[in-house]
Protein backbone atom coordinates (compact mmCIF):
# COMPACT_ATOMS: atom_id res chain seq x y z
CA UNK A 1 0.00 0.00 0.00
CA UNK A 2 1.26 3.46 -0.89
CA UNK A 3 2.78 5.25 2.14
CA UNK A 4 0.55 8.30 1.73
CA UNK A 5 -2.51 6.05 1.67
CA UNK A 6 -1.28 4.31 4.81
CA UNK A 7 -0.83 7.68 6.52
CA UNK A 8 -4.34 8.76 5.57
CA UNK A 9 -5.69 5.48 6.87
CA UNK A 10 -3.84 5.97 10.15
CA UNK A 11 -5.26 9.48 10.52
CA UNK A 12 -8.74 8.17 9.78
CA UNK A 13 -8.42 5.41 12.36
CA UNK A 14 -7.03 7.69 15.06
CA UNK A 15 -8.93 10.86 14.33
CA UNK A 16 -12.19 9.80 12.76
CA UNK A 17 -12.88 6.32 14.07
CA UNK A 18 -15.57 7.46 16.51
CA UNK A 19 -18.18 10.12 16.03
CA UNK A 20 -17.45 11.95 19.28
CA UNK A 21 -13.90 12.41 20.56
CA UNK A 22 -12.89 14.33 23.72
CA UNK A 23 -11.84 17.86 22.82
CA UNK A 24 -8.47 17.41 24.49
CA UNK A 25 -7.70 14.48 22.15
CA UNK A 26 -8.88 16.41 19.11
CA UNK A 27 -6.00 18.87 19.49
CA UNK A 28 -7.63 21.66 21.51
CA UNK A 29 -5.37 20.99 24.51
CA UNK A 30 -1.65 21.53 24.07
CA UNK A 31 0.34 22.25 27.26
CA UNK A 32 3.51 22.57 25.17
CA UNK A 33 2.09 25.12 22.78
CA UNK A 34 4.57 27.89 21.87
CA UNK A 35 2.65 31.17 21.98
CA UNK A 36 3.16 33.36 18.90
CA UNK A 37 3.43 37.14 19.06
CA UNK A 38 0.47 37.33 16.69
CA UNK A 39 -1.83 35.09 18.77
CA UNK A 40 -4.94 36.46 20.43
CA UNK A 41 -4.89 35.21 24.03
CA UNK A 42 -7.91 34.83 26.29
CA UNK A 43 -8.27 33.91 29.93
CA UNK A 44 -11.51 32.27 31.04
CA UNK A 45 -12.73 31.54 34.55
CA UNK A 46 -14.25 28.07 34.19
CA UNK A 47 -16.60 26.24 36.54
CA UNK A 48 -16.88 22.73 35.04
CA UNK A 49 -19.93 20.58 35.56
CA UNK A 50 -19.45 17.92 38.27
CA UNK A 51 -17.34 15.11 36.90
CA UNK A 52 -15.92 17.13 33.99
CA UNK A 53 -12.13 17.27 33.99
CA UNK A 54 -10.86 20.90 34.02
CA UNK A 55 -8.48 20.21 31.14
CA UNK A 56 -11.30 18.76 29.04
CA UNK A 57 -13.48 21.76 29.94
CA UNK A 58 -10.71 24.15 28.83
CA UNK A 59 -10.24 22.19 25.60
CA UNK A 60 -13.98 22.27 24.98
CA UNK A 61 -14.00 26.06 25.38
CA UNK A 62 -11.10 26.33 22.94
CA UNK A 63 -12.88 24.08 20.48
CA UNK A 64 -16.32 25.63 20.67
CA UNK A 65 -14.91 29.17 20.40
CA UNK A 66 -12.88 28.31 17.31
CA UNK A 67 -13.40 25.45 14.84
CA UNK A 68 -15.06 22.54 16.65
CA UNK A 69 -18.56 21.19 16.77
CA UNK A 70 -19.98 18.33 18.85
CA UNK A 71 -18.76 15.60 16.51
CA UNK A 72 -15.89 14.97 14.14
CA UNK A 73 -16.43 16.37 10.65
CA UNK A 74 -14.61 15.19 7.52
CA UNK A 75 -14.25 18.71 6.19
CA UNK A 76 -11.56 19.36 8.79
CA UNK A 77 -9.26 17.66 6.27
CA UNK A 78 -10.00 20.46 3.81
CA UNK A 79 -8.61 23.14 6.14
CA UNK A 80 -5.40 23.92 7.96
CA UNK A 81 -7.17 22.59 11.04
CA UNK A 82 -4.03 22.27 13.17
CA UNK A 83 -3.42 25.99 12.67
CA UNK A 84 -7.01 27.14 13.08
CA UNK A 85 -7.82 25.11 16.17
CA UNK A 86 -7.60 27.27 19.29
CA UNK A 87 -5.21 25.82 21.85
CA UNK A 88 -5.91 25.63 25.57
CA UNK A 89 -2.39 25.58 26.94
CA UNK A 90 -2.66 26.18 30.68
CA UNK A 91 -5.18 25.48 33.45
CA UNK A 92 -4.71 26.85 36.98
CA UNK A 93 -7.00 26.53 40.00
CA UNK A 94 -8.53 29.84 41.10
CA UNK A 95 -7.21 30.80 44.56
CA UNK A 96 -9.79 30.30 47.34
CA UNK A 97 -12.46 29.27 44.83
CA UNK A 98 -12.99 25.51 44.78
CA UNK A 99 -14.17 24.05 41.49
CA UNK A 100 -13.11 27.14 39.52
CA UNK A 101 -10.17 27.25 37.13
CA UNK A 102 -8.35 29.78 34.98
CA UNK A 103 -8.05 28.48 31.43
CA UNK A 104 -5.56 30.14 29.08
CA UNK A 105 -6.41 29.82 25.39
CA UNK A 106 -4.53 30.96 22.27
CA UNK A 107 -6.20 31.79 18.95
CA UNK A 108 -4.46 32.23 15.63
CA UNK A 109 -4.88 35.77 14.32
CA UNK A 110 -6.34 34.51 11.03
CA UNK A 111 -9.48 33.38 12.85
CA UNK A 112 -10.64 37.00 13.11
CA UNK A 113 -11.69 39.61 10.57
CA UNK A 114 -9.50 42.69 10.59
CA UNK A 115 -10.89 45.67 12.48
CA UNK A 116 -14.11 43.96 13.59
CA UNK A 117 -15.14 43.80 17.24
CA UNK A 118 -18.31 42.00 16.15
CA UNK A 119 -16.37 39.17 14.55
CA UNK A 120 -13.91 38.91 17.43
CA UNK A 121 -16.72 38.64 19.96
CA UNK A 122 -18.74 36.18 17.88
CA UNK A 123 -15.99 33.65 18.55
CA UNK A 124 -14.74 34.60 22.00
CA UNK A 125 -18.14 35.10 23.68
CA UNK A 126 -20.34 33.24 21.22
CA UNK A 127 -22.07 29.87 21.66
CA UNK A 128 -19.41 28.68 24.07
CA UNK A 129 -21.10 30.46 26.99
CA UNK A 130 -24.10 28.16 26.69
CA UNK A 131 -22.02 24.99 26.55
CA UNK A 132 -23.37 22.26 28.82
CA UNK A 133 -19.95 20.96 29.89
CA UNK A 134 -19.40 24.09 31.98
CA UNK A 135 -21.64 25.23 34.81
CA UNK A 136 -20.42 28.83 34.47
CA UNK A 137 -17.91 30.67 32.32
CA UNK A 138 -16.41 34.15 32.50
CA UNK A 139 -14.02 35.93 30.16
CA UNK A 140 -11.53 37.61 32.50
CA UNK A 141 -8.90 39.13 30.23
CA UNK A 142 -7.46 39.16 26.73
CA UNK A 143 -4.19 39.98 25.03
CA UNK A 144 -4.68 41.60 21.66
CA UNK A 145 -1.55 41.33 19.49
CA UNK A 146 -0.10 44.45 17.91
CA UNK A 147 -0.69 43.03 14.45
CA UNK A 148 -4.43 42.88 15.16
CA UNK A 149 -4.60 46.18 17.06
CA UNK A 150 -3.21 47.96 14.02
CA UNK A 151 -6.37 47.07 12.10
CA UNK A 152 -8.47 49.20 14.49
CA UNK A 153 -8.90 52.97 14.49
CA UNK A 154 -8.70 53.47 18.25
CA UNK A 155 -10.20 56.50 20.05
CA UNK A 156 -11.59 59.11 17.70
CA UNK A 157 -10.01 62.01 19.60
CA UNK A 158 -8.06 60.77 22.62
CA UNK A 159 -7.15 62.36 25.93
CA UNK A 160 -4.37 64.64 24.67
CA UNK A 161 -6.38 66.20 21.85
CA UNK A 162 -9.46 66.51 24.07
CA UNK A 163 -7.48 68.49 26.64
CA UNK A 164 -6.17 70.74 23.90
CA UNK A 165 -9.69 71.26 22.59
CA UNK A 166 -10.99 72.04 26.07
CA UNK A 167 -7.90 74.14 26.90
CA UNK A 168 -7.86 72.29 30.19
CA UNK A 169 -4.73 70.75 31.68
CA UNK A 170 -3.47 69.42 35.00
CA UNK A 171 -6.77 68.54 36.61
CA UNK A 172 -9.76 66.22 36.26
CA UNK A 173 -12.59 67.50 34.11
CA UNK A 174 -15.86 68.18 35.91
CA UNK A 175 -19.28 67.19 34.70
CA UNK A 176 -22.82 66.40 35.73
CA UNK A 177 -25.71 64.40 34.37
CA UNK A 178 -29.00 66.24 33.96
CA UNK A 179 -31.53 65.10 36.56
CA UNK A 180 -34.24 64.00 36.54
CA UNK A 181 -33.05 62.00 33.59
CA UNK A 182 -36.56 61.78 32.12
CA UNK A 183 -39.54 64.13 32.07
CA UNK A 184 -38.09 67.64 31.66
CA UNK A 185 -39.17 69.90 28.82
CA UNK A 186 -36.54 71.07 26.38
CA UNK A 187 -36.41 74.58 27.83
CA UNK A 188 -36.05 73.40 31.42
CA UNK A 189 -33.48 70.84 30.33
CA UNK A 190 -31.41 73.54 28.65
CA UNK A 191 -31.66 75.68 31.78
CA UNK A 192 -30.08 72.87 33.81
CA UNK A 193 -27.23 72.72 31.31
CA UNK A 194 -26.67 76.48 31.48
CA UNK A 195 -26.74 76.65 35.28
CA UNK A 196 -24.31 73.76 35.69
CA UNK A 197 -21.80 75.08 33.19
CA UNK A 198 -22.03 78.65 34.46
CA UNK A 199 -21.34 77.38 37.98
CA UNK A 200 -17.97 75.96 36.95
CA UNK A 201 -18.46 72.56 35.34
CA UNK A 202 -16.78 71.66 32.06
CA UNK A 203 -19.50 69.34 30.79
CA UNK A 204 -23.15 68.55 31.27
CA UNK A 205 -24.48 65.26 30.02
CA UNK A 206 -27.57 63.46 28.78
CA UNK A 207 -28.30 60.25 30.63
CA UNK A 208 -28.37 56.87 28.95
CA UNK A 209 -32.13 56.64 28.43
CA UNK A 210 -32.89 60.14 27.16
CA UNK A 211 -33.31 59.83 23.39
CA UNK A 212 -36.43 61.27 21.73
CA UNK A 213 -39.49 60.74 23.90
CA UNK A 214 -42.91 62.45 23.74
CA UNK A 215 -42.05 64.91 26.53
CA UNK A 216 -38.93 66.14 24.69
CA UNK A 217 -37.86 65.33 21.16
CA UNK A 218 -34.18 65.11 20.33
CA UNK A 219 -33.95 68.16 18.09
CA UNK A 220 -35.58 70.35 20.74
CA UNK A 221 -33.15 69.04 23.35
CA UNK A 222 -30.11 69.66 21.17
CA UNK A 223 -31.10 73.26 20.46
CA UNK A 224 -31.83 74.20 24.06
CA UNK A 225 -28.70 72.42 25.33
CA UNK A 226 -26.43 74.21 22.89
CA UNK A 227 -28.01 77.55 23.77
CA UNK A 228 -27.04 76.82 27.37
CA UNK A 229 -23.52 75.77 26.35
CA UNK A 230 -22.94 78.89 24.26
CA UNK A 231 -24.26 81.29 26.90
CA UNK A 232 -22.17 79.65 29.64
CA UNK A 233 -19.04 79.69 27.49
CA UNK A 234 -19.54 83.37 26.67
CA UNK A 235 -20.00 84.37 30.30
CA UNK A 236 -17.15 82.25 31.71
CA UNK A 237 -14.57 82.50 28.95
CA UNK A 238 -14.05 78.73 29.20
CA UNK A 239 -14.66 75.99 26.66
CA UNK A 240 -17.80 74.10 27.65
CA UNK A 241 -19.66 71.11 26.29
CA UNK A 242 -22.72 68.93 26.64
CA UNK A 243 -22.83 65.22 25.74
CA UNK A 244 -25.71 65.05 23.27
CA UNK A 245 -27.00 61.47 23.25
CA UNK A 246 -27.51 60.42 19.64
CA UNK A 247 -28.55 56.85 20.50
CA UNK A 248 -31.52 55.85 18.37
CA UNK A 249 -33.32 52.91 16.80
CA UNK A 250 -31.30 52.79 13.58
CA UNK A 251 -27.90 53.85 12.29
CA UNK A 252 -29.62 56.26 9.91
CA UNK A 253 -31.28 58.00 12.85
CA UNK A 254 -28.02 58.13 14.81
CA UNK A 255 -26.12 59.63 11.89
CA UNK A 256 -28.86 62.24 11.45
CA UNK A 257 -28.70 63.23 15.11
CA UNK A 258 -24.90 63.25 15.15
CA UNK A 259 -24.79 65.46 12.06
CA UNK A 260 -27.23 67.88 13.66
CA UNK A 261 -25.17 67.97 16.87
CA UNK A 262 -22.19 69.01 14.79
CA UNK A 263 -24.22 71.62 12.88
CA UNK A 264 -25.35 73.32 16.09
CA UNK A 265 -21.76 73.56 17.32
CA UNK A 266 -21.34 70.69 19.79
CA UNK A 267 -17.82 69.38 20.34
CA UNK A 268 -19.03 66.05 21.76
CA UNK A 269 -21.78 63.51 21.21
CA UNK A 270 -22.77 60.41 23.11
CA UNK A 271 -23.86 56.82 22.51
CA UNK A 272 -24.90 53.91 24.74
CA UNK A 273 -23.17 50.54 24.95
CA UNK A 274 -26.48 48.82 24.22
CA UNK A 275 -26.42 49.95 20.57
CA UNK A 276 -23.95 47.14 19.87
CA UNK A 277 -20.35 46.77 18.79
CA UNK A 278 -20.85 47.42 15.08
CA UNK A 279 -22.85 50.59 15.75
CA UNK A 280 -20.22 51.76 18.24
CA UNK A 281 -17.44 51.31 15.69
CA UNK A 282 -19.52 53.05 13.03
CA UNK A 283 -20.10 56.05 15.28
CA UNK A 284 -16.41 56.13 16.26
CA UNK A 285 -15.43 56.34 12.60
CA UNK A 286 -17.97 59.11 12.10
CA UNK A 287 -16.57 60.99 15.12
CA UNK A 288 -12.99 60.73 13.82
CA UNK A 289 -14.06 61.93 10.38
CA UNK A 290 -16.05 64.84 11.83
CA UNK A 291 -13.60 65.86 14.56
CA UNK A 292 -16.02 65.12 17.42
CA UNK A 293 -15.36 63.68 20.88
CA UNK A 294 -17.34 60.46 21.40
CA UNK A 295 -18.68 59.61 24.85
CA UNK A 296 -19.85 56.06 25.62
CA UNK A 297 -22.26 55.33 28.46
CA UNK A 298 -21.81 51.72 29.57
CA UNK A 299 -25.56 51.13 29.89
CA UNK A 300 -26.23 47.42 30.18
CA UNK A 301 -22.72 46.26 31.03
CA UNK A 302 -23.55 44.95 34.48
CA UNK A 303 -25.97 42.41 33.02
CA UNK A 304 -22.92 40.40 32.02
CA UNK A 305 -19.94 41.91 33.88
CA UNK A 306 -21.01 42.06 37.52
CA UNK A 307 -21.22 38.40 38.54
CA UNK A 308 -17.82 36.94 39.25
CA UNK A 309 -18.36 33.43 37.92
CA UNK A 310 -20.20 34.06 34.64
CA UNK A 311 -20.18 36.66 31.87
CA UNK A 312 -17.13 38.80 31.25
CA UNK A 313 -15.03 41.23 33.17
CA UNK A 314 -15.45 44.93 32.48
CA UNK A 315 -11.72 45.22 31.74
CA UNK A 316 -12.37 43.25 28.54
CA UNK A 317 -15.06 45.74 27.54
CA UNK A 318 -12.53 48.52 28.23
CA UNK A 319 -10.08 46.88 25.82
CA UNK A 320 -12.69 46.38 23.13
CA UNK A 321 -13.95 49.95 23.44
CA UNK A 322 -10.43 51.37 23.19
CA UNK A 323 -10.05 49.36 20.00
CA UNK A 324 -13.49 50.35 18.73
CA UNK A 325 -12.68 54.04 19.09
CA UNK A 326 -14.63 55.74 21.87
CA UNK A 327 -13.10 58.71 23.71
CA UNK A 328 -14.94 58.40 27.04
CA UNK A 329 -16.32 55.43 28.95
CA UNK A 330 -17.82 55.18 32.41
CA UNK A 331 -15.33 53.06 34.37
CA UNK A 332 -16.27 53.26 38.05
CA UNK A 333 -15.73 55.54 41.03
CA UNK A 334 -14.63 53.29 43.95
CA UNK A 335 -16.49 55.58 46.38
CA UNK A 336 -19.85 55.98 44.63
CA UNK A 337 -23.11 54.05 44.51
CA UNK A 338 -22.10 51.62 41.77
CA UNK A 339 -20.02 48.43 41.90
CA UNK A 340 -16.32 49.21 42.29
CA UNK A 341 -13.51 47.37 44.05
CA UNK A 342 -10.47 49.69 44.35
CA UNK A 343 -7.99 47.36 42.66
CA UNK A 344 -10.40 46.34 39.91
CA UNK A 345 -11.18 50.00 39.15
CA UNK A 346 -7.45 50.76 39.02
CA UNK A 347 -7.04 47.99 36.48
CA UNK A 348 -9.87 49.42 34.35
CA UNK A 349 -8.35 52.91 34.38
CA UNK A 350 -4.88 51.61 33.52
CA UNK A 351 -6.35 49.61 30.64
CA UNK A 352 -7.91 52.76 29.22
CA UNK A 353 -4.99 55.13 29.81
CA UNK A 354 -1.64 53.34 29.70
CA UNK A 355 0.35 52.80 26.48
CA UNK A 356 1.69 49.50 27.83
CA UNK A 357 0.35 47.15 30.49
CA UNK A 358 2.38 44.64 32.45
CA UNK A 359 0.93 41.59 34.17
CA UNK A 360 -0.65 42.74 37.44
CA UNK A 361 -2.68 39.98 39.06
CA UNK A 362 -4.01 42.08 41.98
CA UNK A 363 -5.55 44.44 39.40
CA UNK A 364 -6.82 41.54 37.32
CA UNK A 365 -4.38 42.07 34.45
CA UNK A 366 -3.29 38.59 33.35
CA UNK A 367 -1.44 39.52 30.18
CA UNK A 368 1.13 42.02 29.05
CA UNK A 369 -0.50 44.38 26.56
CA UNK A 370 1.21 46.73 24.11
CA UNK A 371 -1.36 49.25 22.88
CA UNK A 372 0.54 49.98 19.66
CA UNK A 373 0.07 53.76 19.84
CA UNK A 374 -3.74 53.60 20.05
CA UNK A 375 -4.89 56.78 21.75
CA UNK A 376 -6.01 56.88 25.36
CA UNK A 377 -9.63 56.72 26.48
CA UNK A 378 -10.77 59.19 29.16
CA UNK A 379 -12.41 57.29 32.04
CA UNK A 380 -15.58 58.78 33.49
CA UNK A 381 -16.47 58.46 37.19
CA UNK A 382 -20.15 58.84 37.95
CA UNK A 383 -22.82 57.53 40.27
CA UNK A 384 -23.27 58.65 43.87
CA UNK A 385 -20.27 60.95 44.22
CA UNK A 386 -20.18 64.40 45.84
CA UNK A 387 -17.72 67.17 46.67
CA UNK A 388 -17.00 65.81 50.15
CA UNK A 389 -15.20 62.88 48.51
CA UNK A 390 -12.96 65.02 46.31
CA UNK A 391 -9.69 64.05 48.01
CA UNK A 392 -10.50 60.36 47.68
CA UNK A 393 -11.57 60.67 44.06
CA UNK A 394 -8.31 62.37 43.08
CA UNK A 395 -6.30 59.85 45.08
CA UNK A 396 -7.98 56.81 43.55
CA UNK A 397 -8.58 58.05 40.01
CA UNK A 398 -5.88 60.63 39.22
CA UNK A 399 -6.13 63.61 36.87
CA UNK A 400 -7.14 61.97 33.59
CA UNK A 401 -10.79 61.43 34.45
CA UNK A 402 -14.13 63.17 34.11
CA UNK A 403 -15.77 63.45 37.54
CA UNK A 404 -19.52 63.45 36.94
CA UNK A 405 -21.58 64.85 39.81
CA UNK A 406 -25.24 64.46 38.85
CA UNK A 407 -27.20 64.41 42.07
CA UNK A 408 -24.11 65.94 43.67
CA UNK A 409 -24.71 69.07 41.58
CA UNK A 410 -28.41 69.23 40.88
CA UNK A 411 -29.36 68.11 44.39
CA UNK A 412 -27.73 71.15 46.00
CA UNK A 413 -30.26 73.02 48.19
CA UNK A 414 -29.26 76.40 46.74
CA UNK A 415 -29.67 75.33 43.14
CA UNK A 416 -27.75 73.86 40.25
CA UNK A 417 -25.27 76.69 39.82
CA UNK A 418 -24.40 76.55 43.51
CA UNK A 419 -23.91 72.79 43.27
CA UNK A 420 -21.54 73.22 40.35
CA UNK A 421 -19.60 75.93 42.18
CA UNK A 422 -19.24 73.70 45.24
CA UNK A 423 -17.70 70.97 43.12
CA UNK A 424 -15.36 73.33 41.28
CA UNK A 425 -14.13 74.99 44.49
CA UNK A 426 -13.64 71.60 46.15
CA UNK A 427 -11.55 70.43 43.20
CA UNK A 428 -9.47 73.60 42.95
CA UNK A 429 -8.76 73.64 46.69
CA UNK A 430 -7.64 70.03 46.64
CA UNK A 431 -5.35 70.58 43.67
CA UNK A 432 -3.84 73.65 45.32
CA UNK A 433 -3.12 71.64 48.46
CA UNK A 434 -1.56 68.86 46.40
CA UNK A 435 0.60 71.30 44.46
CA UNK A 436 1.76 72.83 47.74
CA UNK A 437 3.00 69.41 48.83
CA UNK A 438 0.38 68.79 51.50
CA UNK A 439 -0.97 65.34 52.28
CA UNK A 440 -4.29 66.10 50.65
CA UNK A 441 -5.66 62.59 51.27
CA UNK A 442 -5.19 62.65 55.04
CA UNK A 443 -5.99 66.36 55.31
CA UNK A 444 -8.80 66.29 52.76
CA UNK A 445 -11.74 66.98 55.10
CA UNK A 446 -9.91 69.91 56.70
CA UNK A 447 -8.90 71.31 53.30
CA UNK A 448 -12.55 71.26 52.27
CA UNK A 449 -13.68 72.91 55.50
CA UNK A 450 -11.11 75.67 55.06
CA UNK A 451 -12.21 76.27 51.47
CA UNK A 452 -15.85 76.36 52.57
CA UNK A 453 -15.14 79.35 54.82
CA UNK A 454 -15.10 81.55 51.73
CA UNK A 455 -17.53 79.51 49.61
CA UNK A 456 -21.07 79.28 50.89
CA UNK A 457 -22.21 76.69 48.31
CA UNK A 458 -19.40 74.33 49.35
CA UNK A 459 -20.26 74.71 53.03
CA UNK A 460 -23.91 73.94 52.29
CA UNK A 461 -22.94 70.85 50.31
CA UNK A 462 -20.63 69.57 53.06
CA UNK A 463 -23.36 70.12 55.64
CA UNK A 464 -25.89 68.27 53.51
CA UNK A 465 -23.96 65.22 52.34
CA UNK A 466 -21.32 65.08 55.07
CA UNK A 467 -19.51 61.75 54.75
CA UNK A 468 -22.30 59.81 53.06
CA UNK A 469 -21.00 56.76 51.22
CA UNK A 470 -22.16 53.44 49.79
CA UNK A 471 -20.13 50.78 51.56
CA UNK A 472 -21.26 47.46 50.16
CA UNK A 473 -19.06 44.47 49.51
CA UNK A 474 -18.03 44.35 45.86
CA UNK A 475 -19.02 41.26 43.93
CA UNK A 476 -16.01 41.53 41.61
CA UNK A 477 -12.82 41.53 43.66
CA UNK A 478 -9.22 40.46 43.12
CA UNK A 479 -8.45 36.75 43.34
CA UNK A 480 -4.85 37.12 44.45
CA UNK A 481 -5.04 39.65 47.30
CA UNK A 482 -7.59 40.71 49.87
CA UNK A 483 -9.15 44.03 48.86
CA UNK A 484 -11.94 45.13 51.15
CA UNK A 485 -14.38 47.59 49.66
CA UNK A 486 -13.15 51.14 50.21
CA UNK A 487 -14.42 52.37 53.56
CA UNK A 488 -14.89 56.02 52.73
Swiss-Prot record:
Gene Ontology molecular-function annotations: magnesium ion binding; monooxygenase activity; ribulose-bisphosphate carboxylase activity
Keyword Isomerase: no
Transmembrane segments: none
Highest taxon above the source species: Eukaryota
Name of the molecule in the record: Ribulose bisphosphate carboxylase large chain
Site (Transition state stabilizer): 337
Organism: Porphyridium aerugineum (Red microalga)
Reaction(s) catalysed (UniProt annotation): 2 (2R)-3-phosphoglycerate + 2 H(+) = D-ribulose 1,5-bisphosphate + CO2 + H2O; D-ribulose 1,5-bisphosphate + O2 = 2-phosphoglycolate + (2R)-3-phosphoglycerate + 2 H(+)
Taxonomic path: Eukaryota, Rhodophyta, Bangiophyceae, Porphyridiales, Porphyridiaceae
Any one GO cellular component localisation term in the record: chloroplast
The keyword Cell wall biogenesis/degradation is annotated on this UniProt entry: no
InterPro entries: RuBisCO, RuBisCo_large_chain_AS, RuBisCO_lsu_C, RuBisCO_lsu_C_sf, RuBisCO_lsu_fd_N, RuBisCO_lsu_N_sf, RuBisCO_lsuI
Major location category of this protein: plastid
Amino acid sequence: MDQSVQERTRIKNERYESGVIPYAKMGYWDPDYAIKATDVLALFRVTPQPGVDPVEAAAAIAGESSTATWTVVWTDLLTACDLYRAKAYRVDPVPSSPDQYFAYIAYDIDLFEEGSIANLTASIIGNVFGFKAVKALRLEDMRIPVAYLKTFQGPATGVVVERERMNNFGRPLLGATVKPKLGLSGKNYGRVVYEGLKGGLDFLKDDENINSQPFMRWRERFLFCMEGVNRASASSGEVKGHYLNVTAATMEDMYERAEFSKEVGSIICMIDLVIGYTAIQSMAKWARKNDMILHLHRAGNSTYSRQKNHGMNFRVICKWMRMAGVDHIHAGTVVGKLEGDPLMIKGFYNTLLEPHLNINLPEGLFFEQNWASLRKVMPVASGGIHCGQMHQLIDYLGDDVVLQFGGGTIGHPDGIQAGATANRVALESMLLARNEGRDYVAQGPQILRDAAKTCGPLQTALDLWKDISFNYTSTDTADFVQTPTANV
